[in-house]
C-alpha cells in the first residue's frame, strides 16, 4: 500500500478509536432543509418509536386531531434508547408493560413493511448520556436508513423532547441550548453526515414548543386554568411532582406539535376536548388557553426550517 494511503488509514483508525465521528458543518446541515416538504395529500399512517415521553395517550390524541383515516402503531419502553430498539440482544426496560395495547407493532417489522408514511423516532433523555454511552447518531442513521430502504418516500422525524423540571442548569435553559448542541449538533449533524439516509431527518420540536408556551404562560397573569409549567406534568400517586412526564394538558401540546409538523397545517381551531387511549375523557384546557397552545405551536413550527414545513415569509 502507498505510504500516504497507509498514513490516512492509520489516522482514521486512530480517530475511530478515540470516538471521532464524521459530522456535517452547521451550514451544510441547514442546507438539507432549504426546501420544505410538500404537504401530505391523504391521512397518514405513523409509526412512533421511543419511550414514555411518547406514551399511549399522545398518539391517540394526534389521531383524534388528524381525523378519519389517520392510523398509528408504536414500540415503546421505559427510558428506551434507539440502540435498545435496534439491537436484538439489548433489553428494552418496561417492554411488556409499555407495549401491552392493541397499537403495538414490532419496530423492525413495522419499518420494513413499507406501510408507514411517517416514522417518528426519539431518543432517551438524559440526551447527553444517550449520545455518550448509547451512540445516538449511529442509531438515528440506522433507523432512518432502514425506513427509506424499504420505502424511499418515508418521512422520518426526530421528536425533540425536554429534561427534568428540576435540572440543575435550568429547565428552560436546557431546552434552549440542547436543540443546537445535542439534537442538531450531535444526532442530526453526525447521523446524516454519511449521506446514506435517503434524505434528511426532520424535527418535531416539542421541547421548543413547550418552552415557548411556558414563557407565555408564566408571564403574569398566566392563562385561564394554568399558572405554572408544573401544571403540564403529572403528579405521582403520593402527590409529589413528576418532573418529566406530561399530563393530559402537556400531551395535548405535544400532539398539536406532531399534527402541525406531520400534516403541515395550522392547528388553530382544532378540538381541545379529547379522549385518552383507554377511552376516558382527557383533562381539557380552557378554550382560551387551548387557542394559545395552538398559536404557539404554529409560531414555532413555521419559524424552524428543520420541521420540513414552509416557513413564514
Per-segment meaning from a language model:
Residues 5-12:
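Sec-dependent signal peptide recognition
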Residues 40, 52-56, 133-138, 173-177, ...:
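Soluble non-cytosolic domains of exported or imported proteins
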Residues 16-17:
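C-terminal motif of bacterial Sec signal peptides marking the signal peptidase cleavage site
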Residues 44-45, 56-139, 143:
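Conserved SGNH/GDSL esterase-like catalytic core that processes O-acyl groups on lipids
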Residues 20, 227-313:
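Conserved catalytic region of serine esterases and O-acyltransferases that act on ester linkages
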Residues 52, 56, 61-69, 122, ...:
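Structured segments of extracytoplasmic/periplasmic soluble domains
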Residues 104-248:
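Alpha-helical cap/lid subdomain in secreted, periplasmic
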Residues 23-65:
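N-terminal module-boundary/linker segments of secreted carbohydrate-active enzymes
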Amino acid at each position: 500500500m502507498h505510504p500516504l494511503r497507509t498514513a490516512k488509514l492509520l489516522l482514521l483508525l486512530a480517530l475511530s478509536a478515540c470516538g471521532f465521528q464524521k459530522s456535517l458543518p452547521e451550514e451544510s446541515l441547514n442546507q438539507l432543509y432549504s426546501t420544505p416538504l410538500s404537504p401530505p395529500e391523504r391521512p397518514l399512517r405513523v409509526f412512533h418509536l421511543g419511550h414514555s415521553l411518547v406514551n399511549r395517550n399522545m398518539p391517540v390524541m394526534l389521531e383524534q386531531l388528524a381525523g378519519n383515516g389517520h392510523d398509528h402503531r408504536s414500540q415503546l419502553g421505559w427510558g428506551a434508547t434507539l440502540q435498545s430498539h435496534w439491537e436484538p440482544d439489548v433489553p428494552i426496560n418496561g417492554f411488556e408493560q409499555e407495549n401491552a395495547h392493541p397499537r403495538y407493532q414490532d419496530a423492525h417489522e413495522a419499518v420494513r413493511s413499507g406501510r408507514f408514511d411517517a416514522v417518528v423516532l426519539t431518543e432517551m433523555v438524559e440526551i447527553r448520556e444517550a449520545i455518550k454511552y448509547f451512540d445516538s447518531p449511529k442509531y438515528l442513521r440506522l433507523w432512518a436508513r432502514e425506513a427509506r430502504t424499504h420505502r424511499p418516500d418515508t418521512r422520518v422525524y426526530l421528536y425533540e423532547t425536554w429534561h427534568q423540571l428540576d435540572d440543575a442548569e435550568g429547565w428552560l435553559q436546557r431546552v434552549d441550548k440542547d436543540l443546537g448542541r445535542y439534537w442538531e449538533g450531535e444526532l442530526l449533524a453526525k447521523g446524516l453526515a454519511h449521506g446514506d439516509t435517503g434524505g434528511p431527518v426532520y424535527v418535531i420540536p416539542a421541547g421548543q414548543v413547550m418552552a415557548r408556551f411556558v414563557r407565555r404562560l408564566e408571564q403574569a397573569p398566566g392563562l385561564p386554568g394554568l399558572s405554572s409549567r408544573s401544571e403540564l406534568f403529572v403528579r405521582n400517586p403520593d402527590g409529589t411532582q413528576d418532573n418529566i412526564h406530561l399530563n393530559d394538558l402537556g400531551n395535548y401540546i405535544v400532539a398539536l406539535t406532531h399534527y402541525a409538523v406531520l400534516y403541515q397545517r395550522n392547528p388553530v381551531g382544532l378540538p381541545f376536548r379529547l379522549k385518552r387511549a383507554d377511552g376516558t375523557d382527557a383533562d381539557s384546557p380552557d378554550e382560551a388557553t387551548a387557542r394559545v397552545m395552538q398559536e404557539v405551536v404554529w409560531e414555532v413550527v413555521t419559524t424552524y426550517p428543520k420541521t420540513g414545513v414552509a416557513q413564514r415569509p
